[in-house]
Every structure is written in C-alpha cells, then in structure tokens.
Swiss-Prot record:
Key word Cytoplasm present: yes
Protein role: Required for rescue of stalled ribosomes mediated by trans-translation. Binds to transfer-messenger RNA (tmRNA), required for stable association of tmRNA with ribosomes. tmRNA and SmpB together mimic tRNA shape, replacing the anticodon stem-loop with SmpB. tmRNA is encoded by the ssrA gene; the 2 termini fold to resemble tRNA(Ala) and it encodes a 'tag peptide', a short internal open reading frame. During trans-translation Ala-aminoacylated tmRNA acts like a tRNA, entering the A-site of stalled ribosomes, displacing the stalled mRNA.
Protein name as annotated: SsrA-binding protein
Family statement drawn from the similarity comment of this UniProt entry: Belongs to the SmpB family.
GO biological process terms, semicolon-separated: trans-translation
SUPFAM superfamilies (alphabetical): Small protein B (SmpB) (SSF74982)
GO annotation, cellular component aspect: cytosol
Record's keyword annotation contains Cytoplasm: yes
Gene Ontology molecular function, alphabetical: RNA binding
Membrane spanning stretches: none
InterPro entries membership: SmpB, SsrA-bd_prot, SsrA-bd_prot_CS
Pfam family, one: SmpB
Length: 160
C-alpha cells in the first residue's frame, strides 16, 4: 500500500535568496537539513525567514549556516530567549561535506544559501557552491534577460 502524501497548503518554499543568483554564478547545488529549535519551526511555518546575506562556513568538520534570519513569533517564543540570527547547524552526508569543503578551500569559491523549503515535514536548505560575478557578467545577464522578454513580446505580437 502506498503512503499518502501530506497535504501542503500553499507553496513549499519558505524563503529564497534571489540576490545570491545575481551576485554569484552557482556551480553546484546541494540539499541540507537544518537543526532547529521549536520556536524556529513555528516561525518557518508562518513564513518568517530571510536568507539574504546568508552563507555557510565549516568548523570542526561540520557545516553551519550564518546570517539567516528567522523572526520569532510573539505567541510561540514568550518563554524562551530567541536569537533570530543564530548560527544553525546543517545536516549533510560526509561525502557532500568533503566535496563542499574541498571546493571552498580553493580560491574564489564560497557556499551560499539559495532557498529554504519544506520537504514533507522537514525544513531543508538548498545551498550552492558559488563563485563571485564581476560587474560586466551581471550586466550581460541583465541584457540577456531583457532580450528574452523582448523576443517573447515580438513573437506574441507576430502571431496576432
């Protein structure tokens, strides 16, 4: 007998880091679990997360997420002292951890958080190995995106 999928109201995406895709070229993506406290889970369910300026560092053979803000709910966090920008441990396989650490130890590479989402009942973070873009690369991306929009507009008007 197959297992029923849990009903998820709305989107499974909690937060996205759109700036990371603009400022970095993403080479490879990984999915990581998060070690959270109870009030953080309730805040994530309410969509109170922000991933801008968040990145991953490695200490003592473990990965930690820095700079991610989870705003506490007044109802859920009245009896605990909440730190919205605390460092959160990431759950990765040993092979993934070694791969990420090897890439980051090279020059110019960093690991940034791209998005946070629900996978069944678990909150996950999509992290990416990234290399910083130069200004001219950013301008080229903007030109390419605008040309795609113009091309779609021209094709739409040509079909009429």
């Amino acid at each position: 007998m197959t297992k029923k999928k849990a009903y998820k109201p709305g989107s499974a995406t909690i937060a996205q880091n759109k700036r990371a895709r603009h400022e970095y070229s993403i080479e490879e993506e990984f999915e990581a679990g998060l070690v959270l406290q109870g009030w953080e889970v309730k805040s994530l369910r309410a969509g109170k997360a922000n991933l801008s300026d968040s990145y991953v560092t490695f200490m003592n053979g473990e990965a930690y997420l820095f700079g991610a803000t989870i705003t506490p709910l007044n109802v859920a966090s009245s009896h605990v002292v909440c730190d919205p920008i605390r460092t959160r441990k990431l759950l990765l396989n040993k092979r993934e951890m070694d791969s990420l650490f090897g890439r980051v130890s090279r020059d110019g590479y960093t690991v940034v958080a791209l998005s946070m989402y629900w996978k069944n009942a678990w909150s996950k973070v999509k992290i990416g190995v990234a290399k910083g873009k130069k200004d001219h690369d950013k301008r080229d991306d903007i030109k390419e995106r605008e040309w795609k929009l113009d091309k779609a507009r021209i094709m739409k008007n040509a079909n009429r």
